[in-house]
């Protein structure tokens, strides 16, 4: 459902942000 899609997108976004932060450190 829509909620599942949003949850999946949230995880992808979180992983993307964590990756960017890790690159800067």
UniProtKB/Swiss-Prot annotation:
The keyword Secreted applies. Expressed by the skin dorsal glands. InterPro entries: Antimicrobial15. One of its GO terms (biological process) is symbiont-mediated hemolysis of host erythrocyte. One of its GO terms (cellular component) is extracellular region. Keywords: Amidation, Amphibian defense peptide, Antibiotic, Antimicrobial, Cytolysis, Hemolysis, Secreted. Pfam families: Antimicrobial15. It is found in: Secreted. Its main location: secreted. The modification Valine amide is found at residue 25. Has hemolytic activity against human erythrocytes and antibacterial activity against the Gram-negative bacterium E.coli. Belongs to the frog skin active peptide (FSAP) family. Ocellatin subfamily. This is Ocellatin-1. It comes from Leptodactylus ocellatus (Argus frog).
